[in-house]
């Protein structure tokens, strides 16, 4: 293992007392345990396992992580995890010495028991891991050089959001949520996304190659001007592949539920002209329309609903044209996959992790 010498207690652990540093180690791991994080194995040797995770940087991690100096990576946290079992620590069979290196500048050293949860199939190199029986311990005077690690360049698997979602009804507390986009809600109590999805049969009349079935993405394609503004064009820059632990948007990022009509996301405008692909109008309305009105005002009322007509109607001059209500249904993305989507999206991290639930 290639290493470089660092005096960890002073240069990478804030200049606190040993007692404070111990607390920082444990608190950092506690912050990790508050999330569903995917760890991808980089190396698995007889005496060393090296794993990597990529997550969005939110307010709860700012105390423990120095932002990456590269602009593209400044909003993310890259965590290397080194697992060993030094004989001098007399660890129990399931315990490990764990060294975390966050963004290459902060080191945290603990002993802990790992609880590993494969989420797709046995033998995958990507797993959810939680840590229990956590105790702070001395870090090594020589720590690994993360720049020498071979990082993955290909995904473990291409994720399809439609494989994981479940058709459902609104939860018992439909108002205890926040709007993520048009027809997309984050439920505080259920810790998952609910959204309106197009019936699969309607894909046959969509433009060639169109596969996204969420109402928010469909409306964005229908309404947004085709050239797109800077924010629209930079969608991929706001995402990483948190499941495959890759510095790229990935299939989950391309289908992220943060997509939506540009002028609603930026200015909360509710009367929107159709400036995009008008051929998608046939899956939304029973006839062609040139404008769309959003029903719900997120500043006064938010409610998870299974009815398309509760979310959008035809705009001014087209009020007699009904929506295609039979073509849409409510689905939810299970908690674990909702969490993974949040970890890979800057906007969802801000909306879901840094917001307090409504009082109901």
Curated annotation (Swiss-Prot):
Keywords, alphabetical: Host cytoplasm, Host nucleus, Late protein, Virion, Virion tegument
GO CC term (a single one): host cell cytoplasm
Chief site of localization: virion
InterPro entries in the cross-refs: Herpes_UL16/UL94
UniProt keyword Nucleus, yes or no: no
Compartmental location: Virion tegument; Host cytoplasm; Host nucleus
Similarity comment: Belongs to the herpesviridae cytoplasmic envelopment protein 2 family.
HAMAP family linked: HSV_CEP2
Function field: Plays a critical role in cytoplasmic virus egress. Participates in the final step of tegumentation and envelope acquisition within the host cytoplasm by directly interacting with the capsid. Upon virion binding to target cell, a signaling cascade is triggered to disrupt the interaction with the capsid, thereby preparing capsid uncoating.
Subunit structure: Interacts with cytoplasmic envelopment protein 3 and with the capsid.
Protein name, per record: Cytoplasmic envelopment protein 2
